[in-house]
């Protein structure tokens, strides 16, 4: 069974940077050693946003974007290696999620697409890469997401305490770690995505730092109710979603009914939408004693306060409180999934994704010996 140093690479739906994590992994433990966040050039970020909103690209443009993202991921890995004074031979493998540009796990031909050429990463780092984690699960009838609940269960499950882990990235997803029950998990809906999109369009800021804009506004209740009527929120699990659904176009369609509203009030309403949709799903899933939050949204004081208010009797905390950096959780999970793939172990949970069976995930891109 392969063990040693692994690197996880994650570029999520929030597009706030490439997260790279170094960890030692074996069958008994996962120990994070180092991490860094690598910036995404504005031009690349905009290209990804455009394709996620349905903008058509030529095959040449698509191929260029795939190559550019692969090179970006390789640069991020090499920066971490340099910072830690490590060589390619010191790393067993890289687990790279890739950049999701489309996720459509239902319909006539279910599919998901993550780009960022793994061949570029191997060529530029000299390290074996495990990637393309989601499509095997979809081929077996699953949603292909979320995949992180298996990792949450391995690290954070408790024998008697009802726990849930909430990742608030661009999309929010919930892992249900309930003693005596199969692990559950699904995407609750938008996390930071709509809040970030709104403040970017209105103020040119990548995100609402310390929820300053949202705190200065007031929730527009009719707008909130209008958004909550979206059928995704009442859809039963298993379910997953992404930027191809909850994007700026989705927000604009709801705002057409509310002309002339204060931008800060919209920001406050979007924060409330995220908090309400999460808390409703926690309660519908039977509630928990402890909700551990990770991802960028765990740094949003308004979101954390609203979750605590909407979930009385639940201890709302961050995964940092139990020794796991909330900023690095997903990248760490894909390092762990790479380890499982190389060990020939399944990485999905049918109770979460709806797949017909457990399966080894991903494709292996071996480095030269």
Curated annotation (Swiss-Prot):
HAMAP family: AnhMurNAc_kinase. Keywords: ATP-binding, Carbohydrate metabolism, Kinase, Nucleotide-binding, Transferase. PANTHER family: ANHYDRO-N-ACETYLMURAMIC ACID KINASE. It comes from Escherichia coli (strain SE11). Catalyzes the specific phosphorylation of 1,6-anhydro-N-acetylmuramic acid (anhMurNAc) with the simultaneous cleavage of the 1,6-anhydro ring, generating MurNAc-6-P. Is required for the utilization of anhMurNAc either imported from the medium or derived from its own cell wall murein, and thus plays a role in cell wall recycling. It comes from the Bacteria. Pathway: Amino-sugar metabolism; 1,6-anhydro-N-acetylmuramate degradation; Cell wall biogenesis; peptidoglycan recycling. Its EC number is 2.7.1.170. Belongs to the anhydro-N-acetylmuramic acid kinase family. The keyword ATP-binding applies. It catalyses: 1,6-anhydro-N-acetyl-beta-muramate + ATP + H2O = N-acetyl-D-muramate 6-phosphate + ADP + H(+). It is an enzyme of class 2 (transferase). This is Anhydro-N-acetylmuramic acid kinase. GO terms for molecular function: ATP binding; kinase activity; phosphotransferase activity, alcohol group as acceptor. ATP binds at residues 12-19. Pfam families: AnmK. GO terms for biological process: 1,6-anhydro-N-acetyl-beta-muramic acid catabolic process; amino sugar metabolic process; peptidoglycan turnover.
